[in-house]
């Protein structure tokens, strides 16, 4: 897959293009460009490290939305020995923006739920651009209860710009579906690990984001609103999204510092899309370590710790 470069990655794109040109020029028997290629590769490594060492919040937001970034099903295919998808909320419909089912990771049975985006126009529309409707969240709740019934740990993968705000979704109880999931997840008598793999957009993310551990990929984002939405509200100008991104504090590093994220998982140089296989292996190792720790904790203690964890985020005081 050819990389889809973001604007701030242009120096990287230029260097990689030069390397490709030299490779093509070296097809003749008398041409040896290995020395030049090695020099350019060294320069590429240094330049890439420089760029990704000092990313702004807006640049991280761009990476979180990268069209080649691995999605939930990509990670499932990488980390699971086997996976059986389950469909439908048993009330209205099957929402393709949420996927979930039963899987095994190194032989360990788990239930996995996650947001799912599309890659091309057809699948983007089918997945509703990763924005779930109420039936998606009710499908997720059905799988959560299934996990609890069979005492299987629950893994959720968060990657959505937000819950779908359409009229039909509101008529079918979008806010109730999200609120119900928040309540039920807080009381699940099983280990729950939530991982932000891309965008974490407001209540649409939180509806599968309450658990015992919150993990976040290095270039993921987690916020109450998108930078563009925030800029439109505060400054009546979506072009100020860069400023909004900084003010929102939506990066993994910032959220870890605030205590809202338990662990930040490092991504391959250039982002998860540059080496999805390596990213999947890193994610798998972290998930297994966290599961090992959580499964040793008695259920009553687990629930108490989860309650205290949620309360530690803060409380609203009326005036």
Swiss-Prot record:
Alphabetical list of PROSITE patterns matching this protein: COA_CT_CTER (PS50989)
One GO cellular component, as annotated: acetyl-CoA carboxylase complex
Domain called CoA carboxyltransferase C-terminal: residue spans: 32-293
Catalysed reactions, as listed in the record: N(6)-carboxybiotinyl-L-lysyl-[protein] + acetyl-CoA = N(6)-biotinyl-L-lysyl-[protein] + malonyl-CoA
This protein's record includes keyword Lipid metabolism: yes
Compartments reported by the entry: Cytoplasm
Predominant location category: cytoplasm
Record-level Gene Ontology MF annotations: acetyl-CoA carboxylase activity; ATP binding; carboxyl- or carbamoyltransferase activity
Keywords assigned by UniProt, alphabetized: ATP-binding, Cytoplasm, Fatty acid biosynthesis, Fatty acid metabolism, Lipid biosynthesis, Lipid metabolism, Nucleotide-binding, Transferase
Pathway membership, UniProt: Lipid metabolism; malonyl-CoA biosynthesis; malonyl-CoA from acetyl-CoA: step 1/1
EC number from the UniProt entry: 2.1.3.15
Coiled-coil ranges per UniProt: none
Subunit structure: Acetyl-CoA carboxylase is a heterohexamer composed of biotin carboxyl carrier protein (AccB), biotin carboxylase (AccC) and two subunits each of ACCase subunit alpha (AccA) and ACCase subunit beta (AccD).
Family, as annotated: Belongs to the AccA family.
Function recorded in the entry: Component of the acetyl coenzyme A carboxylase (ACC) complex. First, biotin carboxylase catalyzes the carboxylation of biotin on its carrier protein (BCCP) and then the CO(2) group is transferred by the carboxyltransferase to acetyl-CoA to form malonyl-CoA.
Protein name, as recorded: Acetyl-coenzyme A carboxylase carboxyl transferase subunit alpha
Organism placement in taxonomy: Bacteria, Pseudomonadati, Pseudomonadota, Gammaproteobacteria, Lysobacterales
């Amino acid at each position: 897959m050819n990389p889809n470069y973001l604007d701030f990655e242009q120096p990287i794109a230029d260097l990689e293009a030069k390397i490709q040109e030299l490779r093509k020029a070296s097809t003749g028997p008398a041409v040896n460009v290995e020395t030049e290629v090695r020099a350019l590769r060294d320069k590429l490594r240094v330049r890439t490290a420089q760029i990704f060492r000092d990313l702004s919040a807006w640049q991280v937001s761009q990476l979180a939305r990268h069209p080649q970034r691995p999605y939930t099903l990509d990670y499932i295919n990488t980390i699971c020995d086997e996976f059986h998808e389950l469909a439908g909320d048993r009330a209205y419909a099957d929402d393709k923006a949420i996927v979930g089912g039963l899987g095994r990771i190194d032989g360990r049975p788990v239930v996995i739920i996650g947001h799912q985006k599309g890659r091309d126009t057809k699948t983007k529309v089918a997945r509703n651009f990763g924005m779930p409707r109420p039936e998606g969240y009710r499908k997720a709740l059905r799988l959560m209860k299934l996990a609890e019934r069979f005492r299987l740990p629950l893994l959720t993968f968060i990657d959505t710009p937000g819950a779908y705000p359409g009229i039909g979704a509101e008529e079918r109880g979008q806010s109730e579906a999200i609120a119900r999931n928040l309540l039920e997840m807080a009381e699940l008598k099983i280990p729950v690990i939530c991982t932000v793999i891309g965008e974490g957009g407001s209540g649409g993310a939180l509806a599968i984001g309450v658990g015992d551990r919150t993990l976040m990929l290095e270039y993921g984002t987690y916020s109450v609103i998108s930078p563009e939405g925030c800029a439109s509200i505060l400054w009546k100008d979506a072009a100020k999204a860069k400023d909004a991104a900084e003010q929102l504090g939506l990066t993994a590093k910032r959220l870890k510092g605030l205590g809202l994220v338990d662990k930040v998982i490092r991504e391959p140089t250039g982002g998860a899309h540059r080496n999805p296989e390596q990213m999947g292996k890193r994610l798998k190792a972290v998930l297994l370590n966290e599961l090992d720790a959580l499964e040793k904790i008695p259920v009553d203690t687990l629930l108490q710790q989860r309650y205290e964890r949620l309360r530690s985020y803060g409380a609203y005081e009326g005036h």
